[in-house]
Amino acid sequence: EFGILEDGETIFVYVNGQMLGSSKTMPTGKERLLDISHFYFGGDNGEEKGNRHVKVRNVLLYNRVLSASELQCRLPEEVVQKPQSASPTYLKARI
């Protein structure tokens, strides 16, 4: 599971309930931790040729911050397997 929290000043990135990093400002250029060009709900209309796409099976949207224990209880036993040839920002999840 992947989560992004923005509190007005800082952006926090979580993977499987563990904080991956945070930043007071969105990094640009070589400073980027994650390169997410767009994130939207709905179908892919095919306009973005040549880009990698990730399908998200389940999306949960909250209007509050979840505690670490709430995030941990959402995780199935065997959650993430990293493909050997994948870049660090792409994870293969079993949901």
Curated annotation (Swiss-Prot):
Question: Which SUPFAM superfamilies does the UniProt entry name for this protein?
Answer: Concanavalin A-like lectins/glucanases (SSF49899)
One Pfam family, please name it. TS_C
The record's section on Gene3D superfamilies has: 2.60.120.200
Single Gene Ontology MF annotation: exo-alpha-sialidase activity
User: Which N-terminal stretch is annotated as signal sequence?
Assistant: none
Q: What does this protein do?
A: Interferes with the efficient assembly of the host C3 convertase. Could protect parasites from complement-mediated lysis by sera from a number of different species.
- UniProt record similarity statement: Belongs to the receptors of complement activation (RCA) family.
Task: Output this protein's name.
Answer: Trypomastigote decay-accelerating factor
